[in-house]
Amino acid sequence: MRPSRPSSGKNDLFRDRLDAIINPRQALVRLAGVIPWARFDEAFGGFYRPVGRPANATRLMVGLHYLKHVHDLSDEEVVERWVENPYWQFFCGFEFFQHEAPIDASTMTPWRKRIGPQGLEELLKASVEAALQTGTARPESLERVNVDTTVQPKAIAHPTDSRLYLKALQMLVRHAKKHGIELRQSYTRLAKRAAVRARRYAHARQF
């Protein structure tokens, strides 16, 4: 079902209003006023079924994912810190300070899968536009893209540690023979057996 909206808090007469305890000039507050939140409702509306339980508010989910990536946090960490931070709560569309987590952190992964690459691209596009509008980023800074391939999927044999240890030992033994260095024991056979045992343990997921 289409997302719900955060409670307006009309019945929360004895709770603290966020706009009364935050600095309106704080960067996140100013950014919240620039981001076109309604744009996400329109962009993601087609990803929801017409029936069923109402989904979490789009602004809440978008805001949590923005904070998650800006501060390099896990899903669990961003939800935990959200409860402690009035600026984060205001950014996600709440009017009154909340003392409990707005969602279960486990719901963030299904939401990402639901909006897919197209939705994530929309998030990135809106973030860049907001950064340019607020002066956080300059147009020339977007002319070049730095790509980090350290997490690029590669065909690496597992377990890598035991295999590397074995190769290092074999290389040292070869160099020792090449330079005429006599070793009382090379441990080559023992290392091979240990590597095989490590692979078996890894296959059985026993460590």
Curated annotation (Swiss-Prot):
Pfam families per UniProt: DUF772
InterPro entries listed in its UniProt record: Transpos_IS5-like, Transposase_InsH_N
Keywords: Plasmid
NCBIfam families in the record: transpos_IS5_1
UniProt name for this protein: Uncharacterized protein ORF8 in nfe locus
Organism: Rhizobium meliloti
